[in-house]
């Protein structure tokens, strides 16, 4: 039995894989109905549709204006067109004849659907009178109609179905109008008589038969020939085409015929695309049909699920508009290809009973072999399973279950990547053809055969873009490739863009199996040979562990890449980046015994990567890319090489052809992409893909190099090292450890600190009191190492070489020490605490506490300089202590230099603070001791500014005499500013206060003059300290005289002031002044009196007295103004009374006119400046003659009498 004989239906029968909406002949319809497979998914969709549609059928049907739209969507090949075509057959209950037997569509579904209730719903729907119009909108539309295309197509197919003219809607409208009037048949008969042909045969050429039309129209309508001719001529102009009219015409037809009507429109989504106006037209047609026809006219459309993928170029707004249109369709069915295998099994792979038995036997004998043969590497694929049971094997043979999954991905990827035209679908219809074609190719083979994956290529070859198919055809015909090579190339093309299946060697072997018991080892060898051939011919490329089919354009790019010229330095740089940066990573080695980090100098193929200065550890890696690689291939050459100078580590990587060719390709590709960046916009996608491939190739190269490093031979300082690890970083670490332990002789001199070393350093440097330190413990903890560090620092300082912390750390980190940086810092800190060394930064001394920040900041290690500390012997310290005791008049018992210096600093700091307080007081006026204070501060600062203990004691000794003199001056300053300063301030206040202002009066008293003179003498003394005790008595003597004089002048002044105030008060009362006027006059005079009451200055008291006199004159002026106002008011009152009296007398009426009460107005005060009047009369200040005297007196008399006559009183000035 061969494969062709195992199928129930003929394998080579015609299966219409691509369904066309308008291919409805009986033969095609019968096959479609008979072979239509109702999968679980399709049954659910049918249920959903009929749940929506059935209520609109039957006598009790309900109105469904808003639910008459059905939107069927799915990807290419998901069966949308097939679904609505079968639905059209079913709803119209299409009758088909086959081999003389007639069947209706419903009868086919009785066999396919087992649910009786569901069948009853279908039966109800299909037996309701229904007109079904199925059409592909793209094939029926006229591109010139633009936005009206949707409406015109709907009208066209509707007119065509009911017998009217399809191509010319205005002709159809004429027919509709005649039909309404009952004149259509008469018109057709008249036309046949006149023209000799049937109307239906000639109407599409109505322009040529317009006269015959007019005559027939005249006869049918009984109107004149002229009127009929005009009607014909105006048909297209008077045609009222809009959506509302169309829906009304559909309603009229439904009313006349008592049917439902279904417009079933295929591929409407692609047709309207992103045309917003077409979207709105479809929406309006659907809505209006529902409302106007009362749910009897339905619109069922199909569309791509991903419309943007189908037409491209849709914006987000277009997508939103498209979604809104779909929302107007209440019933939405989304078809998928999830049941592709079920369709193919039922339509193509159903077996005969005999075949089932034979295949069952095959499974029983070779089931385990099949499972192993057809399994993929799970690390490189998603879940692609082989056969799992006998039933599955029988149902799918000669195919494997994963054929469905992979082929669907193949169709999808080829179409989306542009390798095929849009007619290639990715659902069951194209897969059905592919599976049939593949099975036919092995139809003559026995039941031990399987379908290798390349067999599917023939089914899609005709759909491919010519450039793609030509590449494969030419390669297979070039005479270099054999048949197997060509078939493998086809396989690689098919899975080129399938992401779920990596095209690795093992997976390609599985895809190439064509027999159940094929020798997989031999097949692998054959596949690998073909891959090498295809790669050499640049038909494919290897990317990581995958093999990738190359298009012509990709081959051109690949050829350009392989011809890119790259020099050795570029390759070496890339190798160094991968080996040292990506794999080994660290540039340091941490020695585990003391946690010390050692810098590594790195070399690759003889080229240094870290500059010319060598570190203590040197690692040299040699690869086959080095021209000297073959020379260093044995102990005889490698041992002496690694022993030269301070020695090094040599790592020699083994030869492995693929790795070293891959590094060339990586660098070539990088250079090619860099050189062509932005230069080839038409190849941007390909170049981007090349960049991605190269990135993946580099990742694989990293893995390969890591493996080679693990296998490499290692030599170190003249010895070949045994392999103790398989990890590259561990191999290098072991070699570094070997070098350190065999070349760092003083490494073990240092005993590592147990504990938090950073905290210990901080504690040592920031301790407040050195007495808290256990100096003995500092020495015992690491004596040899401390001695080594101290010796090296001291030796360099003796040679006048500046020593910085960075120098110390660098020296003891290198061979032969290798000491950790923190351990060396701890040793330096201990030496500083022992007083061996001090610190400075930029020529400024740095206290230990401040040094911690520099210790803790590696960037500032080169700023911290060390100095050897000088010390006095015990006798010198004792002498310095005695000197300080004499100076400070207090005991200094310290015998250690640091303690003595601390005591000196404490005393002098206190003196300095004291002097600063005295200076602040002295600066406030005429205070003694300013020079002594300033000289004392200069002296103390000169001592305190010495940062070294040794220098400070030397300074105290050299300034001993000055300090003793200052000590005596300080006693006077302390006594004055602490005890006598208040008395001195009192003296200053007296001399510069009342004594100064009243001096002229005081000088009239002899005792006061004498005391005042003595006080002023003391005030001017530079050192008045001995006379300070007399100040209080002398002040009291002057104060007593001053008080008597002040009170005498005060009494006299107050009497004068009071008299003036009282006089002004009386004048205000007489003038009946307001309170405001009284305040303005009296208040300033009263304030002057208060000032006179409290003032201790005689001139001030006399000034207040004179001020009161001036204020009295101002008061007179204000009162005079007030009197003038009073007089004006009284005169006005008198005038008013007199006018009233005269008016009464003139009118001879008896009216009593009251005289106003006139209060007496006081006299104004006239100010007369006697001296001024006399000067004006005589013209001078001096009177020399009797005549001048008489003239002056006459003038004064005239002025005074004039004032009296005016009723004023006179105040003389």
From Swiss-Prot:
The keyword Lyase does not apply. SUPFAM superfamilies: P-loop containing nucleoside triphosphate hydrolases. Keywords: Antiviral defense. Transmembrane segments: none annotated. Induction: Transcribed at slowly increasing levels as cells progress from lag to exponential to stationary phase. Disruption phenotype: No methylation of 5'-GGTAAG-3' in chromosomal DNA, BREX no longer confers phage resistance. InterPro entries: Apolipoprotein_A1/A4/E, BREX_BrxC, P-loop_NTPase. GO terms for biological process: defense response to virus. Belongs to the BrxC family. BREX systems (bacteriophage exclusion) provide immunity against bacteriophage. Part of a type 1 BREX system which protects against dsDNA phage. This system allows phage adsorption but prevents phage DNA replication, without degradation of the phage DNA. Methylation of bacterial DNA by PglX guides self/non-self discrimination. PANTHER family: APOLIPOPROTEIN (PTHR18976), LIPID-BINDING PROTEIN (PTHR18976:SF34). This is Probable ATP-binding protein BrxC. The gene is brxC.
């Amino acid at each position: 039995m061969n494969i062709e004989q195992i199928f129930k239906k003929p394998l080579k029968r015609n299966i219409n894989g691509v369904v066309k909406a308008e291919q409805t002949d009986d033969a095609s319809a019968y096959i479609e109905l008979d072979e239509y497979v109702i999968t679980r998914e399709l049954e659910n969709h049918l249920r959903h549709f009929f749940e929506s549609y059935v209520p609109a059928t039957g006598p009790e049907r309900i109105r469904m204006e808003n639910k008459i739209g059905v939107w069927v969507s799915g990807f290419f090949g998901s069966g949308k067109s097939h679904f609505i075509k079968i639905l059209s057959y079913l709803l119209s209950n299409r009758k088909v004849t086959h081999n003389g037997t007639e069947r209706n569509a419903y009868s086919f579904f009785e066999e396919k659907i087992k649910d009786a209730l569901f069948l009853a719903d279908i039966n109800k729907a299909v037996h309701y009178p229904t007109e079904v119009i199925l059409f592909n909108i793209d094939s029926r539309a006229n591109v010139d109609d633009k936005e009206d295309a949707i409406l015109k197509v709907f009208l066209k197919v509707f007119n065509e179905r009911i017998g009217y003219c399809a191509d010319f809607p205005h002709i159809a409208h004429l027919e509709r109008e005649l039909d309404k009037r009952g004149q259509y048949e008469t018109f057709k008969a008249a036309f046949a008589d006149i023209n000799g042909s049937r109307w239906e045969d000639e109407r599409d050429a109505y322009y040529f038969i317009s006269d015959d039309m007019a005559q027939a129209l005249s006869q049918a309508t009984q109107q004149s020939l002229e009127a009929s001719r005009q009607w014909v001529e105006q048909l297209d102009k008077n045609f009222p085409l809009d959506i509302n009219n169309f829906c009304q015409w559909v309603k009229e037809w439904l009313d006349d015929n008592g049917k439902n009507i279904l417009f079933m429109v295929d591929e409407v989504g692609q047709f309207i695309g992103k045309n917003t106006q077409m979207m709105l037209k479809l929406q309006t047609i659907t809505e209006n049909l529902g409302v106007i026809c009362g749910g009897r006219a339905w619109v069922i459309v199909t569309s791509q699920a991903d419309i943007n993928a189908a037409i491209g170029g849709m914006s987000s707004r277009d997508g939103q508009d498209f979604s809104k249109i779909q929302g107007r369709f209440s019933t939405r069915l989304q078809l998928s290809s999830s049941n592709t295998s079920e369709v193919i099994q039922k339509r193509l792979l159903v077996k005969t009973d005999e075949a089932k038995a034979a295949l069952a036997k095959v499974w029983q004998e070779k089931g385990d072999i099949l499972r192993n043969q057809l399994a993929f590497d799970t690390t490189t694929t998603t879940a692609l399973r082989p056969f799992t049971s006998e039933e599955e094997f029988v149902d799918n043979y000669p195919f494997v279950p994963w054929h469905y999954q992979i082929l669907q991905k193949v169709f999808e990827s080829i179409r989306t990547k542009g390798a095929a035209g849009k007619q290639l679908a990715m659902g069951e219809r194209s897969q059905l053809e592919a599976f049939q074609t593949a099975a036919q190719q092995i139809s003559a083979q026995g039941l031990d055969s399987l379908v290798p994956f390349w067999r599917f290529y023939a089914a899609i070859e005709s759909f491919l873009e010519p450039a793609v198919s030509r590449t494969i055809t030419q390669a297979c015909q070039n005479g270099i490739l054999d048949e197997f090579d060509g078939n493998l190339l086809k396989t690689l093309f098919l899975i080129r863009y399938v992401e779920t299946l990596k095209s690795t060697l093992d997976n390609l072997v599985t895809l190439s199996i064509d027999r159940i018991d094929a020798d997989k080892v031999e097949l692998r060898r054959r596949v690998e040979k073909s891959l090498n051939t295809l790669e050499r011919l640049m038909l494919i490329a290897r990317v990581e562990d995958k093999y990738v089919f190359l298009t012509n354009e990709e081959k051109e790019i690949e050829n350009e890449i392989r011809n890119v010229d790259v020099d050795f330095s570029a390759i070496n740089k890339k190798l160094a980046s991968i080996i040292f940066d990506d794999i080994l990573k660290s540039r340091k080695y941490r020695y585990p015994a003391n946690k010390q980090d050692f810098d590594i100098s790195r070399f690759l193929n003889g080229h240094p990567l870290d500059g010319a200065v060598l570190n203590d550890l040197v690692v040299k890696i040699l690869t086959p890319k080095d021209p000297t690689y073959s020379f260093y291939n044995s102990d005889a050459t490698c041992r002496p090489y690694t022993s030269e100078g301070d020695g090094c580590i040599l790592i020699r990587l083994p030869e492995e052809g693929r790795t070293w060719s891959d590094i060339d390709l990586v660098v070539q590709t990088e250079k090619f992409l860099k050189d062509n960046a932005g230069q080839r916009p038409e190849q941007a996608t390909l170049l981007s893909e090349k960049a991605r491939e190269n990135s993946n190739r580099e990742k694989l190269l990293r893995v390969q190099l890591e493996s080679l490093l693990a296998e490499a031979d290692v030599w170190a300082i003249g010895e070949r090292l045994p392999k103790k690890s398989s990890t590259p970083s561990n191999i290098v670490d072991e070699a570094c450890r070997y070098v350190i332990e065999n070349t760092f002789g003083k490494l073990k001199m240092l005993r590592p600190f147990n504990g938090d070393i950073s905290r210990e350093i901080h504690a040592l440097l920031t301790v407040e009191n050195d007495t808290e330190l256990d100096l003995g413990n500092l020495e015992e903890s690491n004596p040899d190492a401390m001695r080594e560090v101290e010796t090296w620092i001291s030796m360099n300082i003796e040679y006048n070489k500046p020593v910085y912390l960075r120098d110390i750390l660098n020296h003891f980190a290198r061979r032969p020490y290798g000491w950790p940086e923190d351990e060396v810092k701890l040793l330096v800190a201990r030496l500083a605490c022992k007083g061996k060394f001090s610190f400075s930064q930029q020529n400024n001394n740095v206290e230990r506490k401040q040094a911690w920040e520099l210790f803790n900041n590696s960037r500032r290690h080169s700023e911290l300089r060390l100095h050897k500390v000088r010390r006095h012997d015990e006798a010198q310290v004792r002498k310095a202590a005695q000197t300080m005791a004499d100076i400070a008049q207090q005991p200094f018992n310290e015998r250690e230099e640091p303690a003595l210096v601390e005591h000196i600093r404490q005393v002098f700091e206190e003196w300095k603070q004291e002097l600063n307080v005295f200076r602040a007081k002295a600066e406030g006026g005429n205070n003694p001791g300013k020079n002594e204070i300033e000289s004392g501060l200069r002296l103390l600062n000169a001592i305190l500014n010495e940062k070294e203990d040794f220098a400070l004691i030397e300074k105290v000794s050299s300034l001993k005499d000055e300090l003793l003199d200052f000590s005596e001056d300080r006693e006077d300053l302390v006594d004055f500013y602490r005890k006598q300063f208040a008395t001195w301030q009192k003296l200053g206040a007296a001399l510069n206060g009342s004594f100064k202002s009243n001096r002229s009066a005081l000088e009239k008293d002899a005792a006061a003059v004498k005391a005042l003179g003595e006080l002023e003498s003391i005030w001017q003394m530079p050192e008045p300290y001995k006379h300070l005790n007399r100040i209080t008595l002398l002040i009291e003597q002057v104060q007593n005289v001053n008080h008597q004089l002040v009170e005498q002048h005060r009494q006299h002044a107050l009497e004068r002031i009071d008299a003036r105030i009282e006089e002004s008060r009386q004048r205000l009362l007489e003038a009946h002044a307001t309170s405001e006027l009284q305040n303005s006059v009296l208040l300033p005079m009263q304030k002057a009196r208060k000032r006179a009451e409290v003032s201790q200055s005689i001139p001030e008291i006399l000034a207040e007295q004179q001020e009161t006199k001036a204020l009295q004159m101002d008061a007179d002026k204000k009162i005079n103004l007030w009197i003038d106002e009073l007089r004006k008011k009284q005169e006005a009152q008198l005038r008013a009374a007199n006018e009233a009296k005269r008016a009464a007398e003139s009118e001879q009426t008896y009216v009593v006119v009251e005289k106003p009460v006139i209060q007496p107005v006081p006299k104004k005060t006239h100010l007369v400046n006697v001296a001024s009047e006399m000067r004006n009369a005589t013209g001078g200040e001096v009177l020399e003659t009797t005549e001048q005297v008489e003239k002056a007196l006459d003038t004064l008399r005239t002025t005074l009498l004039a004032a009296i006559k005016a009723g004023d009183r006179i105040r003389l000035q």
